[in-house]
């Protein structure tokens, strides 16, 4: 199975005034977006939208255990329009200079059901599920690709581990006969320990191992933005280090309505339903977080203020995936902001030191939304040793309307999810500079799908 680009992010470029009626496009005092223009309705829109071709809940941010700083991402996504779900989970341990990550695909009908993987009924408790916490087979990792295997006569068998019914298929390089990947089409059930993976065929040398990873999100009916229980496990792709998150998350204040309205129209309305033609987006940017992170058996009690995105609707195609650059900031003065630059139309990949126009959505401490133009400058290029993609580790963001200059700096260089296609950079960053003419600082995030 060829892994498709796993993209999430700030949708599509369009003229600022057209996208957000009432948005300020000058350097005069920015005008707030009227609250009545928002199409987001909570708690209903916190739930699954079963007709949406794409949907995800994405938790990121900075957590601390005393002086020890961690960046994390827990992303559960459904691309039912392309026939799969996926998770991306990562942890950056800044002091140890370590980054743990894994991307996992889930295929229907046994791996995930796009109609039931999350709760759609607003009269029930909210939940999201990818993977099974109680069965230790979620994916299969090729540890040695071997050579000489026949694409039509190679089988994968799952044995032991106390479970049954697992089914897996190999993807074989037709030229070399190497096992490129193994797709687990049915994870089976009841695997209380990692099962053995056996590859048979006329080739030789290929080996693989079982991987356990999962995401669960739960909250009580009524206001599911409160006391969200997010539990997740990743088995690091490079080292097999196990990382477990057990977090409780509660939003304080109003949601962050992206674009001020929460929606942008992508395709002609007559070409499908509103979920098939529009992109819907809101965030929770003042999330009080507490819980534990366990790294290879070592437990850290953590707290912090984190960020959640919920996006659903139309989001590109496999043939024309969206590419973008994004920075998020949660400032100590109570403001939150998200800047994005979409690589589409006349927007090309910026060169180091080249200022480019961008669009910034901001929220003040009282919850009022603003959308203004900005200028973004990328610096400090870094080449991923895994994918060969060149990312930027520093960004300067100038927001004239708010007399602001913010500098985002990645706290660790290597924070990539490397993939055969569609690698993406997701990383903890600092955010420092000035805002409304006064010194400002806070936690930051850098995202790059290039």
What residue ranges belong to the model's regions?
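Structured soluble/peripheral alpha/beta segments that form catalytic or ligand/cofactor-binding pockets
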Residues: 6-7, 11-133, 211-450
